[in-house]
Amino acid sequence: MEIYGIVYSVKDPAGFGMAEYIIKYYGLEKSNVCKNAITCYVGNNFVLAGFSEDVIYFDFLDGRLPDKVSRYIVLSRHSSAKKVCSYTVHHTGNFGPEAPYGGRPRTLSIANPIVSHKLLINLSILAEEYGRIDEYEVSYEATHHGPTDVRKPLNFIEIGSTIDEWKDPVNHEIVALAVIKFLENPNHECIPVTGVGGGHYPRKHTKMAFEKNYCYGHIMAKYALQYLSPEILEEMIVKSDPVPQRIIVEKKGTRREHRRIIEQYVLNRGIVLEYI
């Protein structure tokens, strides 16, 4: 049985609210199995821990949670300049030479495609049940920000995008229940893939996740294509558990020179390329 590390920042109202719902749902009691944590609880197949640091700086997770934890799910807020109401999942890393929001430059964390796909599906179902599917966008986000130096697969699940949404107890309930439903039935089958192209909310890739059962690891948005290289593509593939054998490219907005890099890479690597 896999043990999941459910982690959050105690300073984040979204993550804190989700964690409080999980604690009350299970009637959890405090534990001392975590190191340097503000809060720590143990469930049947998970450890729930809150830390004082912001989530983008959670590179320390391997040293603070028990060794038996095999994957991480980070409960978090999501900020958007356009103030889009959203429930999102994504993986972490920096494609370019700078890392202004945590992690290291040109480094990706290990993606968690099966877990994030099931969470995405759960979010969609719950948003429908709670009557928020028209108001809130349920979507993948492209890979961005830290942490990057965690040695186990990790993904974020987030509430966006302003303090009003972060503090909304209904949002806490919806996103916490998406995690709870996963924990209670983590078995899931889907087709692991890597994504290239699209916006920060890659709607075509999200559509493929629902329609073709593709579970995405890293997604490189159109705005990051200036950093595309065979080395970055290899990082996107190998930094995923399980490792995908298919790259999905949103053709519109992906320039010819970028498509050539991808086409040569898949030819050398022997994996499938699909344009959408």
Curated annotation (Swiss-Prot):
Signal peptide: none
E.C. designation(s): 3.1.1.96
InterPro entries associated with the record: Deacylase_DtdA_archaea, DtdA
Keyword list, A-Z: Hydrolase, Metal-binding, Zinc
Cofactor note: Binds 2 Zn(2+) ions per subunit.
Recorded superkingdom: Archaea
Gene Ontology molecular functions: D-aminoacyl-tRNA deacylase activity; zinc ion binding
Gene Ontology biological-process annotations: D-amino acid catabolic process
A Pfam cross-reference name: tRNA_deacylase
EC class: hydrolase
Catalytic activity line of the entry: a D-aminoacyl-tRNA + H2O = a tRNA + a D-alpha-amino acid + H(+); glycyl-tRNA(Ala) + H2O = tRNA(Ala) + glycine + H(+)
Cofactor section: Zn(2+)
NCBIfam families per UniProt: PRK03995.1-4
Function summary: D-aminoacyl-tRNA deacylase with broad substrate specificity. By recycling D-aminoacyl-tRNA to D-amino acids and free tRNA molecules, this enzyme counteracts the toxicity associated with the formation of D-aminoacyl-tRNA entities in vivo.
PANTHER family hit by this protein: D-AMINOACYL-TRNA DEACYLASE
Family indicated by similarity: Belongs to the DtdA deacylase family.
Quaternary organization: Monomer.
HAMAP family: Deacylase_DtdA
Protein's UniProt name: D-aminoacyl-tRNA deacylase
Gene transcribed to yield this protein: dtdA
